[in-house]
Structure formats: C-alpha cells, structure tokens
C-alpha cells in the first residue's frame, strides 16, 4: 500500500525528470540511496538497509556484479537503462515490491540465487551455521542431508557447497517453489547432488535416512502475520504462516524427524520469534538454541536420541 508520504515522493521524482538529469552509475546509486532513505518502506528481506538495497537494485538491473570495480561507477548509462532504473525505484516505493523480486536475485551464504514471487526471499540465519559447517552441532561430516521446506533451494545448495561429498534432498510441498529450486540447482550445476522432491514434509520420502536435517519451515503466528509490513504480502503465505502459535508444522517435524535421521543424526530448525512459545510448551525438551554470528535468533539443534526420548510430547 502506498503511503501519502510515498505518493509525494513519487510526484517529486516525476517532476524532477530524473532520467535526463542523472548520467552515471554513481549518479543513480546516490539518487536511489536518497530515495530509499526518504521512503516509507521496510528493509529486511535480504538487506536491512537502503544502501545495500540500492546496490542490488542498480547493479542487478544493469546486469553488473555486486562487486563491480569502483572505477566503473562513472560509466554513463543509456536512455533505456535510465528509464528502467527509474521505473524500478518507482515500483519499489509505490507498490512496496521487495528488491529481490524486482531484480529476480538474492544472496545467501555468498551465492546468488534466482527468486520470484513463487518462493520467499532467502534470509535465514541458518546461513551462519552452514558457513561454519555446523561446527559443534554434528559429530561427523554428513553424507546425506535433507533440506525440508526448501523454497528457492538456497539452504540445500549452500549445504552442497559446504559438504562437497554429500547428497542433498530438497523437499517442498509447493510445486511452484520447487520449480524455482530447480532453476537454482541448474544454475549452480548441482543436478548430480541436489535432488528436488515434492512432498508434504516427509510423506514422499521413502526409506531414506539423513545425517542432518535442516529446515526453515513456516513459523509466523497469526498475530505477527497480520502485522507484517506490506513487502511480506508479496511472498507466498503458505511459506510464512503456521497456525495460531506459529508451530503447527514444526511440531509435525519434531514428531516425524527421528524416523528419518541416522542414529547420530541431528535436526536443525528455525522458528524465529516462535521460539518463546516452543520453550513454554516443551520446557523439558533439550533444544540447543544456537548463538548465531550474524545476529539472528530462533534456531535450535536437537539430537535424534532426544527426539526419540521426548517423542510422545510432540
């Protein structure tokens, strides 16, 4: 929804005849940064500040790398490039469309992924654990990994990079999301190690056991879902909401996971703000709440033996 403040900003942009006044990449970076800074928009879907969003919007739309050498910032733009950039900025502030959807690009664990509105935008704090190869959480290098609720496939693909000898199954209920995951698996040339599977959680996984299950399931409770900024309404609700306490799907995973873990297997799960409700409901369960280097919260690890021990609670 466009606010009155954003409407005034749009009017100013149109009056300023920006495409004629600005010439270089640096001009457009500065202008985009200023506009996003002044706008009534939300940051938090891949980037938490207007400068990083500006870099992605400008450079990605020009088909340039995010680490473009600064000496190229003085390169002049063509009229069509300038018009494209102005329209993208207008769409960002008028419609509140996330930058990742405007550019069909998001970054996770240092890798670029294709994204569109069929899947949520990669931003899981699990990225910090993947980059540390789940140090102190697993006792040996995993041969078989499951990414449950894979969405764009970013966690599965990042795990495949982190563990070059592992095979990774990427499971999602949504066929649309899996189509996006397949694009990313192909782009990263990992078809021989990352396998997309359409399944309602474990339903279509037959006989396979995993050394590591990683999952970022829907976990937003009804109250938070209703209060989310406009940008989140572009993401598929199926991938966000999970009942009144945000834990409907997580509870199913906790109950079923031990049947799909090897003897020393580990479940790593993100529940975000719903961690408070999870702790309150299961005070005796030894969830290991992981301290994340990137500042995120709400990620726990739990051993298979503990899932078995407390199985009847879930």
Swiss-Prot record:
Catalytic activity from the UniProt record: L-glutaminyl-[ribosomal protein uL3] + S-adenosyl-L-methionine = N(5)-methyl-L-glutaminyl-[ribosomal protein uL3] + S-adenosyl-L-homocysteine + H(+)
Q: Is Hydrolase included in the keywords of this UniProt record?
A: no
Q: Which organism is it from?
A: Haemophilus influenzae (strain ATCC 51907 / DSM 11121 / KW20 / Rd)
Its recorded name reads: Ribosomal protein uL3 glutamine methyltransferase
Looking up Pfam families in the UniProt record yields:
MTS
Matches recorded under SUPFAM superfamilies:
S-adenosyl-L-methionine-dependent methyltransferases
Q: What does this protein do?
A: Methylates large ribosomal subunit protein uL3 on a specific glutamine residue.
Q: Is the keyword Repeat assigned to this protein?
A: no
- Which GO cellular component terms are attached? cytosol
- Superkingdom of source: Bacteria
The protein's Enzyme Commission number:
2.1.1.298
Q: What class of enzyme is it?
A: transferase
Q: Which family does it belong to?
A: Belongs to the protein N5-glutamine methyltransferase family. PrmB subfamily.
Q: Which UniProt keywords apply?
A: Methyltransferase, S-adenosyl-L-methionine, Transferase
Provide the GO MF annotations for this entry. nucleic acid binding; protein-glutamine N-methyltransferase activity
Listed under GO biological process in this entry are: methylation
InterPro entries, per the entry = DNA_methylase_N6_adenine_CS (IPR002052), HemK-like (IPR004556), Ribosome_uL3_MTase (IPR017127), SAM-dependent_MTases_sf (IPR029063), Small_mtfrase_dom (IPR007848)
**Which HAMAP family would you find in this protein's record?**
L3_methyltr_PrmB
């Amino acid at each position: 929804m466009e606010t009155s403040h954003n409407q005034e900003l749009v009017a100013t942009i149109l009056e300023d005849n920006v495409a004629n006044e600005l010439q270089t990449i640096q001009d457009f970076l500065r202008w985009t940064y200023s506009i996003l800074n002044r706008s009534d928009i939300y940051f938090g879907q891949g980037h938490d500040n207007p400068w990083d969003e500006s870099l992605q919007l400008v450079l990605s739309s020009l088909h340039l790398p995010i680490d473009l050498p600064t000496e190229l910032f003085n390169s002049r733009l063509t009229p069509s490039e300038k018009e494209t950039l102005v329209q993208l900025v207008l769409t960002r502030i008028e419609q509140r469309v996330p930058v990742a959807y405007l550019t069909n690009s998001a970054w996770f664990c240092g890798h670029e992924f294709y994204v569109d509105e069929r899947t949520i935008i990669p931003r899981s704090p699990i990225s910090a654990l993947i980059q540390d190869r789940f140090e102190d959480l697993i006792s040996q290098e995993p041969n078989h990994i499951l990414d449950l609720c894979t969405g764009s496939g970013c966690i599965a693909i990042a795990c495949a990079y982190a563990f070059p000898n592992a095979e990774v199954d990427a499971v999602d209920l949504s066929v649309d999301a899996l189509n996006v995951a397949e694009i990313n698996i192909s782009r990263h040339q990992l078809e021989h190690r990352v396998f997309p599977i359409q399944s309602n959680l474990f339903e279509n996984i037959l006989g396979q056991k995993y050394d590591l299950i990683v999952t970022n399931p829907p976990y937003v409770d009804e109250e938070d879902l209703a209060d989310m900024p406009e940008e989140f309404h572009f993401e598929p609700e199926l991938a966000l909401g999970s009942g009144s306490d945000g834990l409907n799907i997580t509870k199913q995973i906790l109950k079923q996971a031990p049947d799909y873990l090897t003897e020393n297997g580990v479940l790593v799960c993100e529940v975000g703000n719903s961690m408070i409700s999870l702790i309150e409901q299961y005070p005796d369960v030894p969830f290991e709440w992981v301290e994340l280097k990137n500042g995120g919260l709400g990620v726990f690890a739990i051993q298979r033996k503990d899932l078995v021990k407390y199985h009847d609670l879930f």
